[in-house]
Amino acid sequence: MAVATSVTRCGARRCAAALLWGAALGAGLGPAWAQPAPAYVAVPAGTLASVLTNDATQEDVKVPAFAMRTTPVTQGDFLRFVQAQPLWQRDQVPRTFADAGYLQDWDTANRLADADAAQRPVTHVSWFAAQAYCESEGGRLPTWTEWEYAAAADATRRDARSDPAWLARILGWYARPASAALPAVGSSSPNLYGVRDLHGLVWEWVDDFNALLVNADSRSGDDPDKLKFCGAGAINLQDKQNYAVLMRIALLSSLNASDSTSSLGFRCVRPNLKATP
């Protein structure tokens, strides 16, 4: 319980790095492991009128250049990861780092449900597991700002959010009933940067998910201490017409780092210099 509390109340990434990799390296497991090279594309620097703004300012956010995985991490990718790093297998991972639903859709701890699953996005993964995976391939989870910046682009524009037709299409994706099985990653068309599946496939973890809190006047949360702890991280919501993004904020801000769901996956980012063709 003491460990879980400390993880909740410090920067989640900072706590995870010390706890998770200390345990992994102590067991002789390092971040390097063999796998097919994932595809990353460069996302150039720019500015973003984020739906999240600090109380003190409503200026656009400057976003440094970075590289992003073109698609979410697949079940096949994650299977190779847990085979190389058994700490993250569902029958080995401590409950502090993953809840009882972790990888529950797999056949066993080391086998996917069916042959087609390898190309589907991995879900039922905790924030801790997602962050550990990204670090294992030399990356990390994107910040909310990085994810929002990349997701604002369509095929030809850096920011398509003012286009009602674009917003309607995205909302249409989210309104579809859930299917029995998720489709393979990469099924959607790439955006301006070459990134796919930012909308319409799965929700995605971000590094700073636990800072995505609206201010006390605009939410009826039952944990006022959480708002006090976040302090300057408490935010106001702008652009309330962008319901698809607001739904993501509502989901992510309700989660703990050990939670996993059937609709939540992730992708990784790297420094821009590590982008791959």
Describe the predicted segments one by one:
Residues M1-A12:
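N-terminal secretory signal peptides that target proteins for export/translocation
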Residues A16-G28:
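Bacterial N-terminal signal peptides
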Residues A34-A39, R120-P121, V125-W127, G139, ...:
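Disulfide-stabilized, aromatic/cysteine-rich ligand-recognition loop
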Residues Y40-T47:
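Mature N-terminal segment immediately following signal peptide/propeptide cleavage
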Residues S50-A65, Y243-L252:
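Short, polar loop/linker segments at the starts of domains and inter-domain junctions
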Residues S50-N54, F209-D217:
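Cytochrome P450 core scaffold surrounding the K-helix E-X-X-R motif
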Residues K62-W166, R270-K274:
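Active-site microenvironments of metalloenzymes and redox enzymes
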Residues G172-H199:
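Short, well-ordered junction/capping motifs at the entry into regular secondary structure
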